[in-house]
Amino acid sequence: MKITVITLFPPSHVAGIIAGDGTLSGGHIQGIAPQAFIVSVRVLDAHGKGRLSAMLEGIRWLKENGKRLGIQIVNISVGSVKKQKENSQLVKAVESLWDSGLVICSAAGNEGMQQHNITSPGISRKIITVGSCDDKEMIDEGGRFYHNYSGRGPTIACICKPEIVAPGTNIVATNAMKGKMTALIQ
């Protein structure tokens, strides 16, 4: 399985959570898909800052090259801080990837305690949005538990988000080892 991680350089902690093979821990700490092949698409700078144009370029690159590389899943662990609508350029671009047959997972964002604060592109009704659920201050909203910083829905368009919540704090994962990266697409 090939998974794309839209990330900053070097490949992020998220790549280790997904595909860490446990080599340095003697197999004790592995990602959820240790046999996965990661394709990292750089859309943020070394400080974690980015522009919409870089995200759109990364998505365009995936659309043009994803099938050739056998990519099946795209993980987007970045999001906008501004409230965007479902018809925004970013949401439309991500939905076009979904429509091309890729599974898209996106972070719910870190905008916190109130409703209607899922960040884009997680507001899309097509993609899978993931929130965090593990804080000392767990919040129960109708049987759905959220971390106090995790973005939560429903979206402004009344789409129930996130679809999935999982641990999101103090997660142990691997780092990319020098010489172990197959390729970096910038």
Where in the sequence are the language-model features?
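Extracellular S/T/G-rich loop segment that most often corresponds to the catalytic His/Ser-adjacent loop
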Residues: 122-186
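Short acidic, glycine-rich surface-loop motifs adjacent to enzyme active sites
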Residues: 38, 59-85, 107
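Catalytic-core regions built around general acid/base machinery
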Residues: 89-104
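Glycine-rich, charge-decorated loop segments at or immediately adjacent to ligand/cofactor-binding or catalytic sites
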Residues: 110-126
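Solvent-exposed loop/turn segments at secondary-structure junctions
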Residues: 24, 44-47, 80-83, 110-114, ...
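Short beta-alpha junctions and helix-cap segments that line functional grooves
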Residues: 26-28, 90-94, 114-118, 149-151
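Subtilisin-like serine protease catalytic core
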Residues: 1-53, 67-72, 123-126, 154-161
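Hydrolase catalytic cores
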Residues: 15-18, 39, 43-45, 74, ...
